[in-house]
Regions:
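N-terminal amphipathic/basic leader segments beginning at the initiator methionine
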Residues: 1-44
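Mg2+-dependent prenyl diphosphate-binding active-site environment of isoprenoid biosynthetic enzymes
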Residues: 31, 37-38, 44-198
Length: 198
């Protein structure tokens, strides 16, 4: 199975192709296309579970699309830093982190739709979705440790902490029209920026 970003690569690379904002992204995708395809296959395996509902919920969200930016960023960063070994499992750590956070966010925010489909909790219920999100986060931490060692595990734990604190801040300030720029920036730093930083 190809990554959703894989389809961007050919258009941005052939001679004479018009340059667009996505051209650099397409070039990046092409550099790690094999790793992206491997990570996509690996992600399906990592979402497997002896508990059928956990697997079904994980696949429901993962199969609904998404750009797979976290695996792409991981692969490009690793290659730029000179890493030459296999990357698929490490790439999946960031995507599992993202999937777990999306499952949790939709429950916390009462999301009705995700990626053009009913949000997972509308189909499977809040408790099962929250716990599946926990499984995704735990597997991300395990993968980080297995693939990159204790420093990566600590970094991923820091990111999960930042994201969770950002979500609490967002809840505390929900609906406030007097929200200052500093609080807004703190929320997005803890949520989106922390996730991308992994």
């Amino acid at each position: 199975m190809q990554s959703p970003l894989h389809r961007l690569a050919p258009a941005g690379l052939h001679a004479g192709a018009p340059r667009t904002l996505l051209s650099p992204l397409a070039g990046g995708v092409a550099l790690v296309a094999d790793e992206m395809a491997q990570a996509e296959r690996q992600l399906r395996e990592l979402l497997a579970s002896a508990v059928p509902a956990v697997q079904e919920i994980g696949h429901y969200l993962a199969d609904s699309g998404g750009k797979r930016l976290r695996p792409l960023i991981t692969a490009l960063g690793a290659r730029a830093a000179g890493h030459e070994g296999p990357l698929a499992r490490l790439m999946c750590a960031g995507e599992l982190l993202h999937l777990g956070s999306l499952l949790h966010d939709d429950v916390v925010d009462g999301g009705m739709e995700r990626r053009g489909r009913p949000a997972a909790q509308r189909i499977f219920g809040n408790p099962a979705v929250i716990l599946t999100g926990d499984v995704c986060l735990a597997r991300a931490v395990l993968l980080a440790g297995e693939e990159a060692g204790p420093v990566a595990t600590l970094e991923l734990a820091r990111v999960v902490t930042e994201m969770s604190e950002g979500e609490v801040l967002q809840l505390l300030h929900a609906g406030r029209m007097d929200l200052g720029l500093d609080v807004y920036m703190d929320i997005i730093d803890r949520k989106s920026a922390a996730l991308i930083s992994w």
